[in-house]
Amino acid sequence: MADVEDIQPLVCDNGTGMVKAGFAGDDAPRAVFPSIVGRPRHAGVMVGMGQKDAYVVDEAQSKRGILTLKYPXEHGIVNNWDDMEKIWHHTFYNELRVAPEEHPVLLTEAPLNPKANREKMTQIMFETFNAPAMYVAIQAVLSLYASGRTTGIVLDSGDGVSHTVPIYEGYALPHAILRLDLAGRDLTEYMVKILTERGYSFTTTAEKEIVRDVKEKLAYLALDFEQELETTKTGSAVEKNYELPDGQVITIGAERFRCPEVLYQPSLIGMEAAGIHETTYNSIMKCDVDIRKDLYGNHVLSGGSTMFPGIADRMSKEIQALAPSSMKIKVVAPPERKYSVWIGGSILASLSTFQQMWIAKAEYDESGPSIVHRKCF
């Protein structure tokens, strides 16, 4: 095998909703596709179609009528390893078109990922894909690196889960990490519900994808929710049109800001949970009093569900209301935050100082999967 230094590492960020994959040193992922595996609903239906037992991604999307679609990752944690393996196989061979046995692989994991899961990821990379080296990094930590910081608190909110992760000098503080099972998928479901109240019906998986697009293109966060609702009663300033694939045009108004408001008021969907602002505050309060100032001053947003216009101003306002009055608060919403986990991985894997951090195949062969706890933390 050639020297590890000469070979570009692969970076793969497996989200609940989307896989982001590419090469270390690049400034954006080369491949972004849904974390979906489709399996035939009825044995025999697919006869003569090459008889695959599983389809990934676009194939799954296009044949969705006869396939059952499954997301192998749930709330950020992998729960179906066979399907996850299919997704990695597709990532390496079809999307990136590389031989994984020739590249070190950096994978990402959710904060508080169970130990057994980290071991399983490690085992699959070395035993199934014969990777020469691998590493597992916490998603929120990578987002913080991507913002050019090593200390701060990250709110990472994707499709399946949100976390608040305080990080001090590059290390996540596990006792203060909080998880909120409220994220993009719940917002899409809520948008479906409130559009139904307007008389628009979206029921199939395909139609829900349309609603996800409506959400991504038109939703925003109000600085003051009640005031925004009052404004919409008197005029049509917030109304926007959206053309459906069949040419029908729908109009949406208050739904635009009612949908993401759930992040701050989970009770809107009947959830008994603190909103993202309060969860962030609770995370900070679990940290040593001496570092709180650094956390308040470096609050970084990351993940697709932080892409709503207005989120940074709203977050500042809400945290300001909870924090001590003299505290200086800074909320950072980098424009590339949808991919900042991946970008942080790309940066980390290309650092010369990182090269001694990889778990090498030889170390794995000697120690087994538990090596991951000693080398990745």
Curated annotation (Swiss-Prot):
A Pfam family per the record: Actin
Catalytic activity, EC: 3.6.4.-
Keywords assigned by UniProt, alphabetized: ATP-binding, Cytoplasm, Cytoskeleton, Hydrolase, Nucleotide-binding
Annotated PROSITE patterns: ACTINS_1 (PS00406), ACTINS_2 (PS00432), ACTINS_ACT_LIKE (PS01132)
Highest rank taxon of the organism: Eukaryota
Recorded catalytic activity of this chain's protein: ATP + H2O = ADP + phosphate + H(+)
GO cellular component, one term: cytosol
Cellular location(s): Cytoplasm, Cytoskeleton
GO function terms (MF aspect): ATP binding; hydrolase activity
Primary localization class, coarse: cytoplasm
Record SUPFAM superfamilies: Actin-like ATPase domain
Residues making up the signal peptide according to the UniProt record: none
GO biological processes: cell division
SMART domains: ACTIN
Other noteworthy facts: There are at least 13 actin genes in potato.
Purpose of the protein: Actins are highly conserved proteins that are involved in various types of cell motility and are ubiquitously expressed in all eukaryotic cells. Essential component of cell cytoskeleton; plays an important role in cytoplasmic streaming, cell shape determination, cell division, organelle movement and extension growth.
Record-stated family: Belongs to the actin family.
Protein name stated in the entry: Actin-71
Organism: Solanum tuberosum (Potato)
